[in-house]
């Protein structure tokens, strides 16, 4: 699929068909595409946590998402995206390069997530980026280290 077609075709999906199975290799392909995005000094601070098992997805929906969003990811594979703090936008001694500081990690993750969702579209899968969630519960559920920020 040509890039312009991907951009024009891609939409946020709020209902997923039952039985539409995403493979581990396809998930890895999406993450590889995400990792090709540029980042601050090539720091590559984005991280992904994948939930594929139906029982785990259902538990995650109940425990970590608002009621509004929980219904939107039924029959879906879930990817949690995070970034490592104090690397993108920072010097080796830990001082911020400018006023944005950790904002650069979030910016870089946005670039990565764009690549990921466009790759998903190319593979025939719809996506929905959800910001309304309980970051603390996600951190616990996915064992996300305190050195990372849960974004979506």
Predicted regions and their residues:
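Glycine/small-residue-rich phosphate/adenosyl-binding loop
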Residues: 26-28, 32, 36-110
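Specificity-determining recognition surfaces
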Residues: 1-28, 150-151
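Short beta->alpha linker loops
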Residues: 22, 52-55, 133-134
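Small-aliphatic-rich amphipathic alpha-helix that forms the alpha element of a beta-alpha
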Residues: 34-35, 80, 97-141
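Structural motif
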Residues: 77-79, 127, 148-152
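A generic local secondary-structure boundary/capping motif
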Residues: 68-71, 140-144
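Short basic, glycine-rich beta-strand/loop surfaces that mediate nucleic-acid
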Residues: 59, 141-152
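Arginine/glycine-rich "motif VI" loop of SF2 helicases in the C-terminal RecA-like domain
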Residues: 72, 122, 145-147
């Amino acid at each position: 699929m040509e890039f312009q077609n991907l951009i024009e075709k891609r939409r946020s999906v709020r209902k997923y068909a039952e039985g539409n199975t995403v493979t581990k290799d396809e998930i890895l392909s999406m993450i590889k595409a995400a990792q090709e995005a540029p980042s601050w000094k090539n720091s590559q601070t984005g991280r992904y946590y994948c939930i594929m098992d139906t029982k785990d997805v259902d538990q995650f929906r109940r425990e970590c998402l608002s009621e509004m969003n929980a219904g939107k990811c039924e029959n879906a594979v879930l990817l949690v995206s995070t970034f490592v703090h104090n690397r993108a936008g920072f010097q080796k001694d830990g001082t911020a390069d400018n006023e944005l500081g950790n904002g650069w990690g979030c910016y870089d993750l946005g670039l990565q997530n764009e690549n990921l969702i466009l790759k998903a579209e190319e593979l025939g899968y719809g996506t929905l980026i959800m910001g309304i969630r309980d970051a603390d519960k996600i951190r616990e559920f996915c064992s996300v280290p305190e050195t990372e920020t849960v974004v979506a």
